[in-house]
Amino acid sequence: MKISLEVCANSAQSAIAAEAGGASRVELCENLHEGGTTPSYGQIKIARQLVKIPLHILLRPRAGDFLYSDNEYEIIKADLEYCIQAGCEAVVIGILNADGTVDKPRCAQLIQMAKKAGMYVTFHRAFDLCADMFQALEDVIALGCDCILTSGGKTTAIEGASKIAQLIQKAAGRISIMPGGGVSEYNVADLVHFTGATRIHSSARVRRQSAMIYKNTHIIVGSSFNDEYDLDETSAERVKNIIYKANEQQPA
């Protein structure tokens, strides 16, 4: 079976590169250095216009944990409504309770809204912060999600490979388990081999130098670890390489 790649794209431009490299679908977000947050309406609109492969929109209103206030929950619903209007094929969600369990009532409402519009739903890496991942697996399946994005409860998917393999076995085809987190052309073959996953998630990004001629290097506008003159973007070449390496040892 061919291994497919979902690219975590931090902009419409990255989504275009993902498609050019052969990705099967895109998870569109912003602020990857914070783990990803909901992309702007403009990013969604332009990506939808320019990219033909399925567009999955991350619904995460802020960085940090996945315990949301009432206002934050209303923001998530409003963003979902816009995704429906924009013609996006899918959304990526995840809300937890304070005790580390899945917030089933809120997630159920989001899934109902999405499914009514014919959307595919992925439960994102909030799953990795659950107190009991196997109970969370059953909860997410019962809610009607189509896919779980997970690093196996570790920082990277390769570190969590054994847990991912257990989750895939436990899921038994009831839901797609998609490894993500630090996936690259250098570890994807091992990840596929160890887990048995058939779909992989990666940003496949590179750092691109700004085209600015004048550069004021005496000021940092954003976070201290960001360089205003370096930009992260998905690389079509890296997308191709990851797909090739993922499938290199697969039977014809």
What does each model-identified segment do?
Residues G118-I158:
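Histidine/lysine/aspartate-rich catalytic loop segments that bind and position anionic ligands
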Residues A20-V26, V51-P54, G87-A90, K116-G118, ...:
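Glycine-enriched alpha-helix->loop->beta-strand junction motifs that scaffold or abut catalytic
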Residues R25-T37, Y82, A86-A98, C145-I158, ...:
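Glycine-rich phosphate-binding active-site loops on the catalytic face of alpha/beta enzymes
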Residues I3-V7, V26-L28, L55-L59, V91-I93, ...:
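Hydrophobic faces of well-ordered beta-strands that scaffold small-molecule active sites
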Residues Q13, L32-H56, N71-E74, I95-K115, ...:
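Active-site-adjacent beta->alpha loops and helix N-cap segments on the catalytic face
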Residues A171-A252:
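C-terminal alpha-helical cap/extension of soluble enzyme domains
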Residues Q13-A20, L67-D79, D128-L143, L167-Q169, ...:
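Catalytic cores of alpha/beta
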Residues M1-S11, L59-K77, L96, V121-M133:
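Active-site mouth loops of central-metabolism enzymes
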